[in-house]
Protein backbone atom coordinates (compact mmCIF):
# COMPACT_ATOMS: atom_id res chain seq x y z
CA UNK A 1 0.00 0.00 0.00
CA UNK A 2 1.28 3.45 -0.87
CA UNK A 3 1.81 5.40 2.34
CA UNK A 4 2.31 8.78 0.70
CA UNK A 5 0.11 11.43 2.32
CA UNK A 6 -0.64 9.41 5.46
CA UNK A 7 -0.11 11.44 8.63
CA UNK A 8 1.12 9.39 11.57
CA UNK A 9 0.16 10.41 15.11
CA UNK A 10 -0.76 13.88 13.78
CA UNK A 11 2.94 14.59 13.56
CA UNK A 12 4.71 12.79 10.70
CA UNK A 13 3.72 12.69 7.04
CA UNK A 14 4.89 9.38 5.58
CA UNK A 15 6.70 9.35 2.25
CA UNK A 16 8.44 6.72 0.16
CA UNK A 17 9.43 3.27 1.35
CA UNK A 18 13.16 3.15 2.13
CA UNK A 19 13.45 -0.54 2.90
CA UNK A 20 11.74 -3.48 4.51
CA UNK A 21 12.42 -6.73 6.35
CA UNK A 22 10.34 -9.60 7.69
CA UNK A 23 8.88 -7.67 10.61
CA UNK A 24 9.34 -3.99 9.79
CA UNK A 25 9.20 -1.38 7.05
CA UNK A 26 11.14 1.88 7.02
CA UNK A 27 9.67 5.00 5.43
CA UNK A 28 10.99 8.46 4.78
CA UNK A 29 8.79 10.94 6.65
CA UNK A 30 8.53 14.64 7.39
CA UNK A 31 7.83 16.25 10.73
CA UNK A 32 4.80 18.44 9.94
CA UNK A 33 5.71 21.11 12.50
CA UNK A 34 9.44 21.45 11.84
CA UNK A 35 9.76 20.15 8.28
CA UNK A 36 12.61 17.87 9.45
CA UNK A 37 13.18 14.63 7.54
CA UNK A 38 13.10 11.46 9.63
CA UNK A 39 13.04 7.72 9.03
CA UNK A 40 10.01 5.93 10.47
CA UNK A 41 10.49 2.26 11.29
CA UNK A 42 7.08 0.55 11.46
CA UNK A 43 7.07 -2.73 13.40
CA UNK A 44 4.14 -5.15 13.38
CA UNK A 45 3.51 -6.20 17.00
CA UNK A 46 1.72 -9.43 16.12
CA UNK A 47 4.49 -10.63 13.83
CA UNK A 48 7.28 -10.00 16.33
CA UNK A 49 5.23 -11.54 19.16
CA UNK A 50 4.59 -14.72 17.17
CA UNK A 51 8.28 -15.42 16.66
CA UNK A 52 9.39 -14.33 20.12
CA UNK A 53 11.21 -11.14 19.11
CA UNK A 54 9.54 -8.82 21.62
CA UNK A 55 12.62 -8.73 23.85
CA UNK A 56 14.78 -7.90 20.84
CA UNK A 57 12.59 -4.89 19.98
CA UNK A 58 12.58 -3.73 23.60
CA UNK A 59 16.36 -4.02 23.64
CA UNK A 60 16.71 -1.95 20.49
CA UNK A 61 14.59 0.80 22.02
CA UNK A 62 16.53 0.70 25.28
CA UNK A 63 19.91 0.80 23.58
CA UNK A 64 19.08 3.56 21.11
CA UNK A 65 17.93 5.81 23.93
CA UNK A 66 20.87 4.87 26.14
CA UNK A 67 23.46 5.66 23.46
CA UNK A 68 23.79 9.25 22.24
CA UNK A 69 26.73 9.79 19.94
CA UNK A 70 27.28 11.70 16.65
CA UNK A 71 28.18 8.42 14.93
CA UNK A 72 25.17 6.44 16.18
CA UNK A 73 21.75 6.80 14.53
CA UNK A 74 19.63 8.97 16.82
CA UNK A 75 16.19 7.83 18.00
CA UNK A 76 13.89 10.87 18.25
CA UNK A 77 10.92 9.10 19.78
CA UNK A 78 8.90 5.89 20.00
CA UNK A 79 5.16 5.77 19.47
CA UNK A 80 2.70 2.90 19.69
CA UNK A 81 -0.76 1.97 18.49
CA UNK A 82 -2.66 -1.25 19.24
CA UNK A 83 -1.01 -3.09 16.36
CA UNK A 84 2.19 -1.20 15.51
CA UNK A 85 5.30 0.30 17.07
CA UNK A 86 6.85 3.33 15.37
CA UNK A 87 10.47 4.42 15.71
CA UNK A 88 11.06 7.99 14.57
CA UNK A 89 14.78 7.95 13.81
CA UNK A 90 17.40 10.21 12.34
CA UNK A 91 17.20 10.09 8.54
CA UNK A 92 20.63 9.14 7.19
CA UNK A 93 20.74 10.14 3.52
CA UNK A 94 23.95 8.54 2.30
CA UNK A 95 22.88 4.90 2.39
CA UNK A 96 24.84 1.88 3.60
CA UNK A 97 28.61 1.74 3.75
CA UNK A 98 28.15 -1.70 2.19
CA UNK A 99 27.00 -0.08 -1.08
CA UNK A 100 30.22 1.92 -1.20
CA UNK A 101 32.44 -1.09 -0.48
CA UNK A 102 30.59 -3.31 -2.97
CA UNK A 103 32.01 -1.09 -5.73
CA UNK A 104 35.56 -1.87 -4.62
CA UNK A 105 38.14 -1.15 -1.94
CA UNK A 106 38.40 2.33 -0.43
CA UNK A 107 41.40 4.62 -0.35
CA UNK A 108 43.46 4.27 2.80
CA UNK A 109 42.62 7.72 4.19
CA UNK A 110 38.87 7.19 3.63
CA UNK A 111 38.94 3.72 5.18
CA UNK A 112 40.87 5.10 8.16
CA UNK A 113 38.32 7.88 8.66
CA UNK A 114 35.42 5.41 8.78
CA UNK A 115 37.39 3.10 11.07
CA UNK A 116 38.19 6.00 13.41
CA UNK A 117 34.52 6.98 13.57
CA UNK A 118 33.48 3.36 14.12
CA UNK A 119 35.99 2.75 16.91
CA UNK A 120 35.15 6.08 18.57
CA UNK A 121 31.43 5.26 18.59
CA UNK A 122 31.93 1.68 19.77
CA UNK A 123 34.25 2.87 22.55
CA UNK A 124 31.45 5.18 23.69
CA UNK A 125 28.86 2.36 23.49
CA UNK A 126 31.07 0.14 25.63
CA UNK A 127 31.45 2.93 28.19
CA UNK A 128 27.64 2.91 28.47
CA UNK A 129 27.58 -0.87 28.94
CA UNK A 130 26.31 -1.56 25.42
CA UNK A 131 27.80 -4.14 23.03
CA UNK A 132 26.55 -4.11 19.43
CA UNK A 133 27.35 -7.74 18.45
CA UNK A 134 26.37 -7.39 14.78
CA UNK A 135 28.85 -4.90 13.32
CA UNK A 136 29.14 -5.10 9.53
CA UNK A 137 29.06 -2.61 6.61
CA UNK A 138 25.31 -3.21 6.13
CA UNK A 139 24.70 -1.77 9.62
CA UNK A 140 26.95 1.24 9.04
CA UNK A 141 25.23 4.16 7.31
CA UNK A 142 26.64 7.34 5.79
CA UNK A 143 25.14 10.80 6.19
CA UNK A 144 25.15 13.62 3.63
CA UNK A 145 28.60 14.70 4.84
CA UNK A 146 30.04 11.23 4.35
CA UNK A 147 30.24 10.55 8.08
CA UNK A 148 29.51 7.14 9.53
CA UNK A 149 26.45 6.26 11.62
CA UNK A 150 25.97 2.92 13.40
CA UNK A 151 22.48 1.45 13.15
CA UNK A 152 20.51 -1.72 13.93
CA UNK A 153 20.91 -2.36 17.63
CA UNK A 154 18.44 -5.26 17.60
CA UNK A 155 21.07 -7.83 18.61
CA UNK A 156 22.93 -5.65 21.06
CA UNK A 157 23.44 -6.60 24.68
CA UNK A 158 23.32 -4.45 27.77
CA UNK A 159 25.71 -4.99 30.65
CA UNK A 160 22.98 -6.61 32.77
CA UNK A 161 22.62 -9.38 30.16
CA UNK A 162 25.81 -10.95 31.45
CA UNK A 163 25.53 -14.09 33.54
CA UNK A 164 27.23 -14.75 36.88
CA UNK A 165 30.57 -15.41 35.19
CA UNK A 166 30.46 -11.86 33.80
CA UNK A 167 30.23 -13.10 30.21
CA UNK A 168 27.61 -13.10 27.46
CA UNK A 169 26.31 -16.48 26.30
CA UNK A 170 24.15 -15.92 23.21
CA UNK A 171 25.47 -16.43 19.70
CA UNK A 172 24.72 -13.28 17.73
CA UNK A 173 26.03 -11.60 14.64
CA UNK A 174 26.73 -12.36 10.99
CA UNK A 175 29.03 -15.40 10.49
CA UNK A 176 31.83 -13.74 8.50
CA UNK A 177 32.14 -10.90 11.06
CA UNK A 178 31.69 -12.89 14.25
CA UNK A 179 34.50 -13.53 16.76
CA UNK A 180 35.81 -17.08 17.30
CA UNK A 181 34.80 -17.17 20.96
CA UNK A 182 31.21 -16.36 19.95
CA UNK A 183 31.18 -19.22 17.44
CA UNK A 184 32.53 -21.51 20.17
CA UNK A 185 29.30 -20.90 22.13
CA UNK A 186 31.25 -20.38 25.32
CA UNK A 187 30.94 -17.26 27.42
CA UNK A 188 32.45 -14.23 25.76
CA UNK A 189 33.24 -10.61 26.50
CA UNK A 190 30.99 -8.39 24.35
CA UNK A 191 33.61 -5.64 24.09
CA UNK A 192 36.29 -8.02 22.81
CA UNK A 193 33.85 -9.57 20.33
CA UNK A 194 32.98 -6.10 18.96
CA UNK A 195 36.70 -5.32 18.53
CA UNK A 196 37.07 -8.42 16.34
CA UNK A 197 34.12 -7.35 14.17
CA UNK A 198 35.64 -3.86 13.81
CA UNK A 199 38.81 -5.54 12.55
CA UNK A 200 36.86 -7.46 9.91
CA UNK A 201 35.19 -4.20 8.85
CA UNK A 202 38.58 -2.47 8.52
CA UNK A 203 39.90 -5.34 6.40
CA UNK A 204 36.83 -5.18 4.12
CA UNK A 205 37.14 -1.40 3.69
CA UNK A 206 40.78 -1.67 2.61
CA UNK A 207 40.52 -4.91 0.60
CA UNK A 208 37.02 -4.86 -0.88
CA UNK A 209 36.48 -8.46 0.26
CA UNK A 210 36.27 -10.49 3.47
CA UNK A 211 39.26 -11.92 5.37
CA UNK A 212 37.30 -15.10 6.11
CA UNK A 213 35.17 -16.20 3.18
CA UNK A 214 34.36 -19.79 2.25
CA UNK A 215 31.35 -21.37 0.58
CA UNK A 216 31.63 -24.09 3.21
CA UNK A 217 30.50 -22.59 6.52
CA UNK A 218 32.41 -25.19 8.56
CA UNK A 219 35.66 -24.32 6.76
CA UNK A 220 35.01 -20.60 7.28
CA UNK A 221 34.44 -21.17 11.00
CA UNK A 222 37.66 -23.21 11.15
CA UNK A 223 39.64 -20.32 9.65
CA UNK A 224 38.00 -17.83 12.00
CA UNK A 225 38.76 -19.92 15.09
CA UNK A 226 42.39 -20.31 13.95
CA UNK A 227 42.68 -16.66 12.86
CA UNK A 228 43.80 -17.78 9.40
CA UNK A 229 43.75 -14.83 6.99
CA UNK A 230 46.10 -13.09 4.59
CA UNK A 231 46.42 -9.36 4.00
CA UNK A 232 46.68 -8.17 0.36
CA UNK A 233 50.08 -6.78 -0.61
CA UNK A 234 48.70 -3.22 -0.89
CA UNK A 235 47.96 -3.09 2.86
CA UNK A 236 50.48 -0.80 4.64
CA UNK A 237 52.79 -2.70 7.06
CA UNK A 238 51.35 -0.86 10.08
CA UNK A 239 47.81 -1.93 9.07
CA UNK A 240 48.90 -5.56 8.72
CA UNK A 241 50.41 -5.41 12.20
CA UNK A 242 47.30 -3.76 13.66
CA UNK A 243 44.98 -6.32 12.05
CA UNK A 244 47.09 -9.19 13.36
CA UNK A 245 46.43 -7.86 16.87
CA UNK A 246 42.73 -7.18 16.30
CA UNK A 247 42.01 -10.50 14.56
CA UNK A 248 43.72 -12.46 17.29
CA UNK A 249 41.60 -15.59 17.92
CA UNK A 250 42.53 -15.46 21.61
CA UNK A 251 40.26 -12.81 23.20
CA UNK A 252 42.58 -12.50 26.20
CA UNK A 253 45.53 -11.35 24.09
CA UNK A 254 43.46 -9.45 21.51
CA UNK A 255 44.17 -5.72 21.44
CA UNK A 256 41.78 -3.56 23.46
CA UNK A 257 39.95 -0.57 22.03
CA UNK A 258 41.99 1.97 23.99
CA UNK A 259 45.20 0.53 22.52
CA UNK A 260 43.74 0.69 19.01
CA UNK A 261 43.06 4.38 19.59
CA UNK A 262 46.70 4.89 20.61
CA UNK A 263 48.00 3.17 17.46
CA UNK A 264 50.11 5.47 15.23
CA UNK A 265 48.24 4.52 12.03
CA UNK A 266 44.89 5.09 13.74
CA UNK A 267 46.00 8.42 15.19
CA UNK A 268 46.66 10.08 11.81
CA UNK A 269 44.08 12.87 11.50
CA UNK A 270 42.01 11.49 14.38
CA UNK A 271 39.81 13.95 16.24
CA UNK A 272 38.20 12.66 19.41
CA UNK A 273 34.56 13.70 19.69
CA UNK A 274 33.19 15.14 22.89
CA UNK A 275 29.95 13.32 23.66
CA UNK A 276 26.97 14.91 25.45
CA UNK A 277 26.90 14.55 29.22
CA UNK A 278 24.55 11.79 30.34
CA UNK A 279 21.83 12.61 32.89
CA UNK A 280 22.43 11.77 36.54
CA UNK A 281 21.00 8.43 37.65
CA UNK A 282 18.63 10.06 40.17
CA UNK A 283 17.13 12.17 37.35
CA UNK A 284 16.38 9.01 35.40
CA UNK A 285 15.00 7.10 38.39
CA UNK A 286 12.53 9.88 39.22
CA UNK A 287 10.94 9.56 35.80
CA UNK A 288 10.87 5.80 35.30
CA UNK A 289 7.51 5.28 37.02
CA UNK A 290 5.85 7.73 34.63
CA UNK A 291 6.93 6.02 31.44
CA UNK A 292 4.98 2.77 31.62
CA UNK A 293 1.88 4.68 32.71
CA UNK A 294 2.19 7.01 29.74
CA UNK A 295 1.95 4.15 27.28
CA UNK A 296 -1.02 2.53 28.99
CA UNK A 297 -2.95 5.79 29.41
CA UNK A 298 -2.63 7.28 25.95
CA UNK A 299 -0.61 5.03 23.60
CA UNK A 300 -1.87 6.61 20.40
CA UNK A 301 -0.36 10.05 20.86
CA UNK A 302 1.64 10.37 24.08
CA UNK A 303 5.38 10.19 23.51
CA UNK A 304 6.61 8.51 26.67
CA UNK A 305 10.23 8.81 25.66
CA UNK A 306 10.14 12.59 25.84
CA UNK A 307 10.03 12.08 29.61
CA UNK A 308 13.52 10.66 29.77
CA UNK A 309 16.79 11.21 27.98
CA UNK A 310 18.16 7.78 28.83
CA UNK A 311 16.89 4.46 30.09
CA UNK A 312 18.04 2.80 33.27
CA UNK A 313 18.65 -0.89 33.80
CA UNK A 314 15.61 -3.06 34.31
CA UNK A 315 13.20 -0.65 32.63
CA UNK A 316 10.01 -2.44 31.54
CA UNK A 317 8.73 -1.72 28.04
CA UNK A 318 5.93 -4.28 28.13
CA UNK A 319 3.39 -1.47 27.73
CA UNK A 320 4.33 -1.38 24.05
CA UNK A 321 2.88 -4.84 23.71
CA UNK A 322 -0.54 -4.41 25.29
CA UNK A 323 -1.85 -7.76 24.16
CA UNK A 324 1.32 -9.77 24.35
CA UNK A 325 0.30 -13.41 24.67
CA UNK A 326 1.85 -15.13 27.68
CA UNK A 327 1.33 -18.50 26.06
CA UNK A 328 2.52 -21.80 27.47
CA UNK A 329 2.53 -23.31 24.00
CA UNK A 330 5.46 -21.71 22.22
CA UNK A 331 8.98 -23.00 21.88
CA UNK A 332 12.05 -22.36 19.80
CA UNK A 333 13.95 -25.17 18.11
CA UNK A 334 17.07 -25.65 16.03
CA UNK A 335 15.38 -28.46 14.07
CA UNK A 336 14.19 -27.88 10.51
CA UNK A 337 10.50 -27.79 9.55
CA UNK A 338 10.53 -31.37 8.23
CA UNK A 339 11.85 -32.72 11.55
CA UNK A 340 9.30 -30.67 13.50
CA UNK A 341 6.38 -32.03 11.45
CA UNK A 342 7.81 -35.55 11.75
CA UNK A 343 7.86 -35.24 15.55
CA UNK A 344 4.18 -34.26 15.68
CA UNK A 345 3.35 -37.15 13.31
CA UNK A 346 5.19 -39.48 15.68
CA UNK A 347 3.21 -38.16 18.66
CA UNK A 348 -0.11 -38.54 16.83
CA UNK A 349 0.75 -42.08 15.69
CA UNK A 350 2.12 -43.34 19.01
CA UNK A 351 -0.91 -42.15 20.96
CA UNK A 352 -3.26 -43.83 18.43
CA UNK A 353 -5.62 -41.04 19.39
CA UNK A 354 -5.15 -38.28 16.84
CA UNK A 355 -5.59 -37.79 13.14
CA UNK A 356 -2.96 -35.46 11.72
CA UNK A 357 -3.26 -33.29 8.62
CA UNK A 358 -0.61 -30.99 7.17
CA UNK A 359 -1.25 -27.36 6.22
CA UNK A 360 0.76 -24.55 4.61
CA UNK A 361 1.86 -23.27 8.01
CA UNK A 362 2.18 -26.47 10.05
CA UNK A 363 -0.08 -29.35 11.10
CA UNK A 364 -3.48 -29.94 12.68
CA UNK A 365 -4.11 -32.70 15.24
CA UNK A 366 -7.72 -33.81 15.82
CA UNK A 367 -8.83 -36.31 18.45
CA UNK A 368 -10.63 -39.33 16.99
CA UNK A 369 -12.72 -39.55 20.16
CA UNK A 370 -15.40 -37.08 21.12
CA UNK A 371 -14.77 -35.31 24.40
CA UNK A 372 -16.96 -33.25 26.70
CA UNK A 373 -17.13 -30.40 24.21
CA UNK A 374 -16.64 -32.20 20.92
CA UNK A 375 -13.39 -33.37 19.35
CA UNK A 376 -10.20 -31.87 20.78
CA UNK A 377 -8.31 -30.09 17.97
CA UNK A 378 -4.82 -28.59 18.12
CA UNK A 379 -3.33 -26.27 15.52
CA UNK A 380 0.46 -26.27 15.22
CA UNK A 381 2.12 -23.35 13.41
CA UNK A 382 5.80 -23.30 12.44
CA UNK A 383 7.56 -19.98 11.88
CA UNK A 384 10.98 -19.81 10.23
CA UNK A 385 13.25 -17.25 11.90
CA UNK A 386 16.38 -18.41 10.10
CA UNK A 387 17.10 -21.56 8.09
CA UNK A 388 18.19 -23.36 11.23
CA UNK A 389 16.01 -21.67 13.84
CA UNK A 390 12.21 -21.99 14.16
CA UNK A 391 9.45 -20.87 16.47
CA UNK A 392 6.63 -23.40 17.02
CA UNK A 393 3.27 -22.48 18.49
CA UNK A 394 0.48 -24.92 19.25
CA UNK A 395 -2.97 -23.97 20.53
CA UNK A 396 -6.42 -25.43 21.05
CA UNK A 397 -8.77 -24.77 18.13
CA UNK A 398 -11.60 -27.03 19.31
CA UNK A 399 -12.78 -29.14 22.23
CA UNK A 400 -12.51 -28.84 25.99
CA UNK A 401 -9.87 -26.62 27.59
CA UNK A 402 -9.26 -28.96 30.55
CA UNK A 403 -8.75 -31.94 28.24
CA UNK A 404 -6.33 -29.85 26.18
CA UNK A 405 -4.29 -28.83 29.23
CA UNK A 406 -4.12 -32.41 30.52
CA UNK A 407 -2.97 -33.72 27.13
CA UNK A 408 -0.33 -30.99 26.86
CA UNK A 409 1.04 -31.53 30.37
CA UNK A 410 1.00 -35.33 30.38
CA UNK A 411 1.76 -36.25 26.78
CA UNK A 412 2.52 -33.48 24.30
CA UNK A 413 5.11 -31.39 26.15
CA UNK A 414 7.11 -34.38 27.48
CA UNK A 415 7.15 -35.90 23.98
CA UNK A 416 8.58 -32.70 22.49
CA UNK A 417 11.54 -32.40 24.87
CA UNK A 418 14.08 -33.81 22.38
CA UNK A 419 13.38 -31.08 19.79
CA UNK A 420 12.75 -28.10 22.10
CA UNK A 421 15.59 -25.61 22.48
CA UNK A 422 13.79 -23.16 24.78
CA UNK A 423 10.18 -22.88 25.93
CA UNK A 424 8.81 -19.34 25.67
CA UNK A 425 7.07 -17.52 28.51
CA UNK A 426 7.77 -17.17 32.21
CA UNK A 427 6.07 -20.43 33.14
CA UNK A 428 8.16 -22.44 30.76
CA UNK A 429 11.65 -21.12 31.28
CA UNK A 430 12.95 -21.89 34.71
CA UNK A 431 16.09 -19.85 34.16
CA UNK A 432 14.09 -16.83 32.95
CA UNK A 433 16.50 -16.47 30.05
CA UNK A 434 15.73 -14.11 27.21
CA UNK A 435 15.57 -15.73 23.79
CA UNK A 436 17.82 -14.05 21.24
CA UNK A 437 17.62 -14.98 17.59
CA UNK A 438 20.68 -15.98 15.58
CA UNK A 439 21.02 -14.16 12.27
Swiss-Prot record:
Q: Name one GO molecular function term.
A: protein serine kinase activity
Q: Where do the record's region annotations for Activation loop lie?
A: 152-181
Q: Which residues form the Protein kinase domain?
A: 12-266
Q: Which GO terms describe its biological process?
A: response to abscisic acid; signal transduction
Which key words tag this protein in UniProt?
Answer: ATP-binding, Kinase, Manganese, Nucleotide-binding, Phosphoprotein, Serine/threonine-protein kinase, Transferase
According to the UniProt entry, the note on domains is:
The activation loop within the kinase domain is the target of phosphorylation/activation by upstream protein kinases. The PPI motif mediates the interaction with the ABI (abscisic acid-insensitive) phosphatases.
Protein name in UniProt:
CBL-interacting serine/threonine-protein kinase 20
